Amino acid sequence: MKKLFALSLIVAATCQTLVSAADFPIKDKSVTIVVPFVAGGPTDRVARDLAEAMRKPLGATVVVENVAGAGGTIGANKVSKAPQDGHTVLLHHIGMATSPALYRKMPYNTMDDFEFLGMVNEVPMTLVGRPTLPANNYKELVTWIGQNKGKINLANAGLGAASHLCGLMFQQAVQTDMTTVPYKGTAPALNDLMGGQVDLLCDKTTNTSAQIEGKTIKAYGVTTMKRLTTPALKDVPTLNESGLKDFNVSIWHGMYAPKGTPTDVVAKLNAALKTALRDPDFVKKQEALGAVVVSDKRTDGAEHKKFVAAEIDKWGPVIKAAGQYAD
């Protein structure tokens, strides 16, 4: 009798999963995009644009929930343990790949605890300096760095931030240790850079374009392999062409569901994501943020999973070599 009862529970659970997969999205139930950071930041803005663009292809209300803390790991952990019905997804940035190295104790496994829905966009980085630096181009900057070893300050927006990661990679690329100055966000770091309190910063184009255009900071290069076409940055050379070979750093966003979400639900979410990324209004909003919407191939879940694995392999050694952990 007990065996029969247990079997009936298993059958019921299986049927419930199958019904959830077939009927997704469940009528009158919204889809929640969890953002593992505070409202108002770049990832939050991307998520809100996505929520609007995904409503029609999903045929459901899409809302954003901010679950901030611990460099994005609290929100990501919540999604990893959420119901596997497709109604809770995660929008995360490069921290999805860097957290395994930045945090020595992780509450989830990036590669094993999620279904990868696809990549969304990429945001290039810029290497910039205080306006009073004597160097006017990257070649002159390299000479200046060589003449001032042990005296250079490199700002960032906080441990684990995009600017921190880019700064670590830059130091290793030029084989020079700099004094890392972490701030609580990009705004105060940029203010001190403009004021001459710190020397260098490597941060997103979304944060530096206006200052570069206004000539309140000096631009030494973009971290892409090709020059950017935006008006403020079209004349800024790539670091690669200036001599820092293969220096390619971008901040990206991807979308994920809890591991075990039914395959056909994952397929519906992926299809809705791809439709959203081809929405002209969404593309225009991303361009205004300085972001580039990725191709259909990179929106593929399996393709994105391979990309994240490569990013983990790329950033892990950089972070461990620096010995700068978030916990």
Give the location of each predicted region.
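N-terminal (or domain-start) structured segment
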Residues: A22-D112, K151-N153, L159, Q175-K204, ...
